[in-house]
Structures are given as structure tokens and as C-alpha cells.
Amino acid sequence: MRVTDFAFELPESLIAHYPMPERSSCRLLSLDGPTGALTHGTFTDILDKLNPGDLLVFNNTRVIPARLFGRKASGGKIEVLVERMLDDKRILAHIRASKAPKPGAELLLGDDESIKATMLARHGALFEVEFNDERPVLEILNGIGHMPLPPYIDRPDEDADRELYQTVYGTRPGAVAAPTAGLHFDEPLLDKLRAKGVEMAFVTLHVGAGTFQPVRVDSIEEHTMHSEYAEVPQEVVDAVLAAKARGNRVIAVGTTSVRSLESAAQAAKDALIAPFFDDTQIFIYPGYQYQVIDALVTNFHLPESTLIMLVSAFAGYQHTMNAYKVAVEQKYRFFSYGDAMFITYNPQAISERP
């Protein structure tokens, strides 16, 4: 399959730079997987689409202020984007500089350059950096870091983004990008879902900056997926198995929840799904056999991205590309701060190719 099979024309004006005033007031495009039928509505319609006993699986990662500015002690500006926190002192990061720092180089970070750090080693495209500070990494980032808005949100981060680019249920700091499908759920909607009898479970996948990396090969089978850390604890496994046993659906909120659950299913030897605490490089594209997910809540993704491939593997290629065409015609808002989709599984998708 060619990467270009997943291209579509998107007017710049449809890229959302700010979220809706109310989280749950965005538009919702529903795609019926088996038939391809589309219905238009608002996000709160999700209440009517879920049945008592259905299981919603959320990603409870929390975005860290992962973008740092500063300079090398030897001169030259740098921009640091944390990929992951290794421990209380060390990070793995992308560093933009006119000349990459060498091992042992001292970095001065923050607007006042008050935070000192040392570049320890290079691991491919990533740099291992150690902070020379008493405070733990997370405290330093909260003090001097900027929210790492995606590259297509073409504006500086604002104080409001610290709340807006964050789900209301995120409790596990470590992501450098929000699991954006979850941004649409506010407390009143969560309360109504609970009152209806919808079950909820939480996985953790710390979204890395690699999620924004373009696919740089022509044939998608040759693409190597970036690695991200995911946790699917025993209580999630139990909740999934219980939902299936009573004939209910497992609904993933966001592609990161999909990738967490499907990674746990792949790792399970003789069960549908087993606990998973590891890095995952799962790459889902047409031809993939879904194990766990029955429905999906997700935002609109970038052309030629691994995420539109994941959706195509779930709903079917033709149904997905048609839904995106209609979304553009109907002026839905795209990407992280944009509108959402509710998609049910298409059992025929596995045999469909572009």
C-alpha cells in the first residue's frame, strides 16, 4: 500500500487553532462501519450511541510542559522537546539547534537560563539530557516548560492551553501530546454516561512527539513505528473480558487507547487480552485483525498519517476516505482541537485495501 493512498485535500481554514468554548459542544460525525452510513450531530449525542454495560476505555496520560527554550553554554540557541522522562533527573529529548550539542555539552534552559543541564549521550535522533538541579524533572518542566502544541497549531502556546490541551481525567504525567479524542469529555457528560450505566476503564499511553512525525517511506509496509510506553493493568483486562462476556461493546476513546488495548491483545498468549506494561511499536493499517475494539471515538487525523491508516483498518478504507471527504465538504474542524468521529467496526475492513 502506498502512503499517498491516504492523502486528502484539506483547506488550511479547517485546521482548528483553538477548541470549542465547551468541551462537549463540538460536532460529531458518526460512521457506521458495516454500511458506511454517515450521520451528523454534536458530541453529546454519544450518550444515545452507548448502551448500559458498554465499556469506554480512556487514556489517562497527562501532557507535560515539554517544550523548553535556552542555549548551549558555548553559544547558540536551542529548543528542547522532551520525548520521555527517564527518571527524576534525566530526559530523552529532540533538540533543535544550528549545531547539535556533543556529549558533555552544558545547556542553559528557561527564559532566564537559570536551569543547567548536561547532554549525556545521543541515541539516534534523540538526546539524553540530565538536569543539574535538586528538583525532580517534572517540577522543573512545570516551572519553565511550554505546552507542546502540535506543529499544525500555528501559534505560540498560551496559559489557557495548560488546561485546554489536557483531558479532565488525565492523572499520569508523561505525554508530549494530548490523547485528543478525550478532550471532548467534560464532567457533566461523564456523569451522564455513568448514570446511564456505561462502564469506564483507564489505560495509560504516554504519547510521544513521534506521533507528529510524517511517514517517510512510499510503501507503508516499510514504515517503522515510533515507540511509546503503555500500561494496561489487570483491572482493565477484567473490565474488557466482563463487557465481552455480557455481550456489550468495548469502545476506545482515541487511537492511543486502541493501540494500548491491541498491544495487550497481541501480547496475550492464550487469552483475548492480558496485562501489558511495556513499550509498544504497534502499527495498525488495512489488513490488521482487530482483537478487542468494537467502536472508536476519535478526532480527524492528518493526511497520510499512521492514524488515518488505523481508522481505515477499523472502518474500511473506502468508508473512511469517503467520511473524510464529506467532513471537508461539511466544514468539520480538523486535528487536535477539532471535531470528533464515532465509528463502529466494519468486519469486512480486514479484506479491503486501497
UniProtKB/Swiss-Prot annotation:
Instruction: Name the UniProt key words of this record, in alphabetical order.
Output: Cytoplasm, Queuosine biosynthesis, S-adenosyl-L-methionine, Transferase
Q: What is its EC number?
A: 2.4.99.17
> Where found in the cell?
Cytoplasm
What InterPro entries does the database record attribute to this sequence? QueA (IPR003699), QueA_dom1 (IPR042118), QueA_dom2 (IPR042119), QueA_sf (IPR036100)
Q: In what pathway does it function?
A: tRNA modification; tRNA-queuosine biosynthesis
**Enzyme class name:** transferase
- State the superkingdom: Bacteria
CC per GO annotation: cytoplasm
Catalyses which reaction? 7-aminomethyl-7-carbaguanosine(34) in tRNA + S-adenosyl-L-methionine = epoxyqueuosine(34) in tRNA + adenine + L-methionine + 2 H(+)
In the record, biological process GO terms are:
queuosine biosynthetic process; tRNA wobble guanine modification
Gene Ontology molecular-function annotations: S-adenosylmethionine:tRNA ribosyltransferase-isomerase activity
> Is-annotated flag, keyword Cell inner membrane?
no
Q: Which family does it belong to?
A: Belongs to the QueA family.
Report the NCBIfam families cross-referenced here.
PRK00147.1 (NF001140), queA (TIGR00113)
Function according to Swiss-Prot or TrEMBL: Transfers and isomerizes the ribose moiety from AdoMet to the 7-aminomethyl group of 7-deazaguanine (preQ1-tRNA) to give epoxyqueuosine (oQ-tRNA).
Q: Quaternary form?
A: Monomer.
Official protein name in the record: S-adenosylmethionine:tRNA ribosyltransferase-isomerase
Organism equals Klebsiella pneumoniae subsp. pneumoniae (strain ATCC 700721 / MGH 78578)
Provide the organism lineage as a comma list.
Answer: Bacteria, Pseudomonadati, Pseudomonadota, Gammaproteobacteria, Enterobacterales
